[in-house]
Amino acid sequence: MAKALLLENIHPDAAQSLRDHGFEVETRKGALGEKELIEALDGVSLLGIRSKTAVTAAVIDACPSLTAVGCFCIGTNQVDLDYAGKHGIGVFNAPYSNTRSVVELVICDIICLMRRIPAHTHH
C-alpha cells in the first residue's frame, strides 16, 4: 500500500480522499524541520505540505520512495523544483484554490469602506 504524509493541518478531506484511493495516510498538524522530515518520509511516496515545510535537495536525496509533493498553498517556492524534477518527483499546487474567498473578502471590504464602517468603529 502506498503511503502519504500530510503536514501543516491539511484539510481532513484530503486525507480521506487519499485513503479512498488506497493510500495509508499519516497526518501531522505542524511543519517539520529537515531532519524530522527525512525521518518521517521513510517509505512515503506522496508528501502534502503547505508553505512552512521545506523540501530541499537533502530531503529528496534521503527519500528515494518519494514520487510526488503536493503544495496545498499558492506557491511552490518551498520545494527545490529543479532538483525534484531531475529526480522524477512531480510537484503540484493549488494556485487558485482561494480565489473565491479572496473575492468575497474584497467585496466585503469595499462595502465596509462605502458605509464608512472603519470610521465609526471605536476601540
Question: Model regions: which residues?
Answer:
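Phosphate/diphosphate ligand-binding glycine-rich loop within oxidoreductases
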Residues: E26, G33, S45-H123
